[in-house]
A protein has these predicted regions:
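Glycine-rich dinucleotide-binding loop and its adjacent helix/turn
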Residues: 30-85
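A Rossmann-like FAD-binding core segment of flavoenzymes
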Residues: 1-31, 48, 52-58, 84-167
């Protein structure tokens, strides 16, 4: 059944009644980061990319360098999909440590096993563009872990220079 809310009692009943239960959170919209350059040609949203792949419209990423921002399961899905769509290099950029990622450990390990590079303690600052206005890189700032905020390690800028990751 689609589009149906489930409480704890009903979930227990479903587990007893069925061999498998699929729960989807229904995330249908993208989360903008507010980075300068995020509207540039060559910037693709996770939802749009994964929806296209689900519709068998595989993007041809042959020879391309791809940066994926985030440390959750969706970021791992996008990174692994980019590899499978022919990307030359996939870098996962995350502002905290790998151990702080919200993605399942198996998803992180799977992304690494498929050749994705995980750049921890790396905060995105801006999307750089080339002469034609297309994405050419991701400007990032190295981070260090500071005091926890709201129960999570709080990254803050390290005293090291910004750099640009080509993508």
């Amino acid at each position: 059944e689609l589009d149906h809310s489930v409480n704890g009692e009903e979930l227990s009943r479903l587990r007893d009644e069925f061999d498998a239960v699929y729960l989807a959170i229904g995330a249908h919209s993208d989360k903008k980061l507010g980075l300068p350059g995020e509207e540039a040609p060559g910037v693709e949203s996770a939802v749009k990319m994964l929806r296209a792949i689900g519709d068998d419209e595989l993007p041809d990423l042959s020879g391309q360098r791809v940066c994926v921002i985030g440390g959750g399961n969706v970021a791992m899905d996008v990174a692994r999909s980019a590899v499978r769509c022919g990307a030359e290099k996939v870098s996962i950029v995350y502002r905290r440590r790998i151990c702080d990622m919200t993605a399942q450990d198996a998803e992180i390990a799977g992304a690494q096993a498929e050749g994705c590079e995980v750049l921890e303690l790396t905060a995105p600052l801006a999307i750089e563009t080339g002469e034609e206005g297309r994405v050419s890189g991701l400007r990032v700032q190295p981070q260090i872990i500071g005091e926890p905020r709201r129960g999570r390690p709080a990254p803050r800028a390290a005293a090291t220079p910004e750099r640009v990751i080509p993508c």
